[in-house]
């Protein structure tokens, strides 16, 4: 299971800054496209090939809320799900009474807690940390969230117990499908419809009701595992913070899956919660199929309105197939597995270096890269850098100056010519390095003698 790291601390100690710093340490699969919203209370991050989910529990001890609310429902869910807790304090302000109360509450959780002393830039780290020795937390780290100091070593230590997991499946293994979406969007109805059609005898439901439910079954001699996730609910005013953490199980299921099936409600259209979930799926690089449920019985003008909204708001996910279905009546459900298999096989495909290089040459010849300071950017060769999602590594010169518009052009052309369906594509650029950079030019003996003659001649002319 993907580890969960929770950030805890009083307000203004730098939790949001650290959260943003950590979630941006990975090479983002997608840019912040207009219209793609994210709930920044949780996020996906990666450090040295180890993926994890990070959660910001918000400030404690503000707005006249007692520190005991740490143990209340609004933070209890997140802290119970967390594998590691990072307790942030302010190295400049020193130890406060609220810090002491939070530490006392954390001790009751029986969780691994790391004390993170923030804002230590320009300070003696030992002196800054010494003020917090009375809290009795042995694992202490001095960092600067705003400047990035100490964060890499912090992540390295807290992730050390967790193994590097790869989720590249082969054809002889079951394809894991995560059914994601808001409550009442029809996830369970759709799964029951699929199971009913396939007449599955085995129905395994491990864990508690709060856990994701994994259901193995066979369809046309292929093995699948359906993962019924907890719904991402709309945030009410009272339970706003509670609802932010109800998504953790869903996010873990998405990270474990090979393909994500995002279910939307045709009656409600695309909500902010849908966009949050879609953003996380794309960030995670997962193969994706979108199903618009409750399509039966809608007026034609409403159907056209929904299609227009999908085209307008989901342009950044145009690689994904969209199906219009009715989980209750079964219409359109049969075509979902065709899309799921296409997306899965696109995500794990392999391409040879000669094929990718020839394709790169054809694409760049069709629309040549721009010139920078009178020199044209050169794209030399390409090779495969990974699977699920597919990663193509392009080598060349002056690639740092390659415009974003041309990068999008390359991405779209590779997707089209490789026939990728239902999976995002990541392209990495690596510029050529001068092998003689920072090396002193060693002269031959003949060149040394000539240099001496020139120097003697120059002196004789003075």
From Swiss-Prot:
The keyword Transferase does not apply. The keyword Oxidoreductase does not apply. Keywords: GTP-binding, Nucleotide-binding, Repeat, Ribosome biogenesis. One of its GO terms (biological process) is ribosome biogenesis. Pfam families: KH_dom-like, MMR_HSR1. GTP 2 binds at residues 181-188, 228-232, 293-296. Residues 3-166, 175-348 form the EngA-type G domain. CDD domains: EngA1, EngA2. GO terms for molecular function: GTP binding; ribosome binding. SUPFAM superfamilies: P-loop containing nucleoside triphosphate hydrolases (SSF52540). Residues 349-433 form the KH-like domain. InterPro entries: G_ENGA, GTP-bd, GTPase_Der, KH_dom-like, KH_dom-like_a/b, P-loop_NTPase, Small_GTP-bd. It comes from the Bacteria. GTP 1 binds at residues 9-16, 56-60, 118-121. GTPase that plays an essential role in the late steps of ribosome biogenesis. Associates with the 50S ribosomal subunit. PANTHER family: GTPASE DER. Belongs to the TRAFAC class TrmE-Era-EngA-EngB-Septin-like GTPase superfamily. EngA (Der) GTPase family. This is GTPase Der. It comes from Legionella pneumophila (strain Corby). The gene is der.
């Amino acid at each position: 299971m993907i580890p969960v790291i929770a950030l805890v601390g009083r307000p203004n100690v730098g939790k949001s800054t650290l959260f943003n710093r950590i979630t941006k340490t990975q090479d983002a699969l997608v840019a912040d496209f207009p219209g793609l919203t994210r709930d920044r209370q949780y996020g996906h991050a990666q450090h040295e090939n180890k993926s994890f989910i990070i959660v910001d529990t918000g400030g404690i001890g503000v707005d006249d809320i007692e520190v005991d609310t740490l143990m209340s429902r609004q933070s209890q869910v997140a802290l119970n799900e967390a594998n590691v807790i990072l307790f942030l304090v302010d190295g400049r302000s020193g130890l406060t009474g609220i810090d002491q109360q939070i530490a006392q509450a954390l001790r009751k959780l029986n969780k691994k807690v790391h004390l993170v002393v923030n804002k230590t830039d320009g300070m003696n780290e030992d002196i800054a940390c010494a003020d917090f020795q009375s809290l009795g937390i042995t694992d202490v780290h001095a960092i600067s969230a705003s400047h990035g100091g100490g964060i890499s070593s912090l992540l390295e230590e807290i992730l050390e117990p967790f193994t590097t997991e790869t989720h590249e499946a082969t054809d002889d293994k079951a394809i894991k499908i995560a059914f994601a979406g808001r409550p009442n969007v029809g996830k369970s109805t759709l799964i029951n419809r699929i199971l009913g059609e396939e007449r599955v005898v085995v129905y395994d439901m491990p864990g508690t009701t709060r856990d994701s439910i994994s259901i193995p079954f066979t369809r046309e001699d292929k093995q699948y595992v359906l993962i019924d996730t907890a719904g991402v609910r709309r945030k009410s005013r009272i339970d706003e913070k509670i609802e932010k953490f109800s998504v953790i199980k869903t996010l873990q299921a998405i990270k474990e899956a090979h393909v994500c099936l995002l279910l939307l409600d045709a009656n409600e259209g695309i909500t902010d919660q849908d966009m949050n979930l879609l953003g996380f799926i794309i960030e995670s690089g997962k193969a994706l199929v979108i199903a618009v449920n409750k399509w039966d019985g809608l007026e034609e003008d409403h159907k056209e309105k929904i299609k227009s909204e999908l085209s307008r708001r989901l342009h950044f996910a145009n690689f994904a197939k969209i199906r219009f279905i009715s989980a209750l009546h079964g219409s359109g459900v049969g075509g979902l597995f065709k899309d799921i298999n296409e997306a899965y096989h696109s995500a794990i495909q392999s391409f040879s270096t000669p094929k990718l290089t020839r394709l790169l040459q054809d694409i760049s010849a069709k629309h040549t890269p721009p010139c920078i300071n009178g020199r044209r950017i050169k794209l030399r060769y390409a090779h495969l850098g990974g699977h699920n999602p597919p990663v193509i590594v392009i080598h060349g010169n002056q690639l740092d100056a390659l415009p974003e518009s041309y990068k999008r052009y390359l991405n779209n052309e590779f997707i089209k010519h490789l026939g990728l369906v239902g999976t995002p594509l990541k392209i990495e650029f690596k510029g050529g390095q001068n092998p003689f950079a920072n090396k002193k030019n060693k002269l031959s003996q003949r060149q040394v003698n000539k240099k001496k003659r020139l120097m003697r001649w120059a002196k004789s002319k003075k």
